[in-house]
């Protein structure tokens, strides 16, 4: 007996749909041609450029056009971010699905996820993951092993809902927040992920730079870190903590190399200098000076990463990192960026961003094409069986 064609087709459709679902503690955000997948375990972020299609374009237009909301979401780590439009409706059958009126036929978690976009063997894949936090003294030596986080591999982050109609510095973005509490250190770590849907200019302290549609920014925030004070009995070495080293593991097509080409820098960095002065010093009260330009790294495949030279401390006080930071380290073929954060009392904010380049052309079969091919093969087999028995 032959299996009915309807059953075979239904089975294949079920397989395709199952591959599109996220796990409970992952979120996928998707723009016109860039997707980012965020993992609650370790806070890992995977970024790829994907092929555009008609449905994705419509979905992105829906997100960009929804700009009526101006309510400040004070629960967010970033008070500059605006919440989703109040017209959005929640699917009662799938509470995690936050849908807008124009998006009622999306997949279960409203993330347009295609799991085959994110493969570890994809050479064009970019990934970023917190590696460790380490308190160091003025000489860069570790203060106390209790004042460190050796690995984030087993750290669980809580993920917010995906906000498809957010704004950052006046630009349309899709965003999701991660947060966790470090029990041993009694500190909080948050990651705010933004996928830009339109190009524009962003300022971070003294640094101004351009973003594109498809740029992904992920602010990393550390709150309430208790630094050693030298005489504190809680610190066994009695050293004084002066900096907090934040290390981030990365995966990229090529080993990151700093961009020195002036033309490429001009495409990224803006300045506010309207006069032809020779003043290269950025004075706080001198609006005629150039803004600093972030460090630009080429990641291979035309992908670029921007690393700010400073951090925001406490009440949005821009503070430069020590000379030589942020810096690239390579250990046993593992690539890492190290950010040396000056001592703070409340919070510290690091602000890296990345723009993925074009994907390397390769032969790939989508789930829809795979289904059509299997259906065609099944029909041909059925016809062949009919001829054999007749």
From Swiss-Prot:
Residues 100-121, 272-292 have a biased composition (Acidic residues). Residues 58-99, 254-271 have a biased composition (Basic and acidic residues). It comes from Acropora millepora. One of its GO terms (cellular component) is membrane. Keywords: Membrane, Signal, Transmembrane, Transmembrane helix. Residues 17-368 are extracellular. The lineage of its organism: Eukaryota, Metazoa, Cnidaria, Anthozoa, Hexacorallia. The chain crosses the membrane at residues 369-389. Residues 390 are cytoplasmic. It is found in: Membrane. This is Skeletal aspartic acid-rich protein 2. Component of the acid-insoluble and acid-soluble organic matrix of the aragonitic skeleton (at protein level). It comes from the Eukaryota. It is a single-pass membrane protein. Residues 53-121, 254-292 are annotated as: Disordered. Residues 1-16 form the signal peptide.
């Amino acid at each position: 007996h032959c299996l009915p064609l309807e059953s075979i087709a239904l089975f294949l459709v079920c397989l395709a749909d199952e591959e599109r679902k996220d796990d409970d503690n992952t979120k996928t955000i998707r723009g016109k041609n860039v997707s980012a997948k965020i993992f609650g375990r370790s806070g890992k972020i995977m970024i790829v450029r994907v092929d555009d299609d008609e449905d994705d374009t419509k979905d992105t237009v829906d997100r960009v056009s929804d700009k009526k909301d101006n309510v400040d979401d004070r629960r967010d780590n970033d008070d500059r971010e605006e919440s989703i439009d109040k017209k959005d409706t929640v699917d009662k059958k799938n509470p995690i699905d936050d849908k807008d009126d124009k998006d009622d036929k999306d997949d279960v978690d409203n993330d347009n996820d295609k799991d085959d976009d994110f493969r570890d063997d994809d050479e064009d894949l970019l990934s970023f993951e917190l590696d460790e936090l380490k308190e160091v003294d003025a000489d860069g030596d570790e203060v106390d092993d209790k004042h460190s986080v050796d690995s984030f591999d087993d750290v669980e982050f809580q993920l917010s809902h995906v906000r498809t109609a957010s704004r950052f510095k006046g630009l349309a973005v899709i965003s999701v927040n991660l947060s966790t509490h470090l029990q041993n250190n009694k500190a909080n770590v948050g990651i705010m992920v933004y996928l830009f849907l339109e190009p524009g200019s962003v300022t971070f302290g003294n640094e101004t730079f351009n973003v594109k549609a498809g740029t992904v920014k992920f602010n990393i925030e550390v709150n309430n870190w208790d630094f050693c004070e030298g005489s504190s009995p809680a610190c066994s070495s009695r050293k004084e903590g002066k900096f907090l080293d934040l290390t981030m593991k990365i995966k990229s097509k090529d080993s990151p190399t700093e961009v020195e080409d002036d033309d490429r820098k001009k495409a990224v960095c803006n300045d506010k200098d309207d006069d032809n002065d020779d003043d290269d010093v950025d004075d706080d009260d001198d609006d005629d000076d150039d803004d600093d330009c972030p460090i630009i790294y080429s990641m291979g495949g035309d992908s670029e990463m921007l690393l700010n030279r400073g951090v925001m401390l406490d009440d949005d006080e821009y503070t430069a990192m020590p000379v030589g930071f942020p810096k690239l380290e390579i250990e046993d073929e593992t690539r890492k960026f190290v950010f040396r954060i000056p001592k703070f009392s409340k919070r510290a904010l690091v602000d890296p961003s990345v723009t993925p380049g074009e994907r390397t052309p390769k032969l790939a079969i989508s789930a829809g094409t795979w289904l059509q091919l299997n259906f065609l093969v099944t029909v041909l087999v059925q016809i062949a069986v009919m001829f054999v028995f007749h």
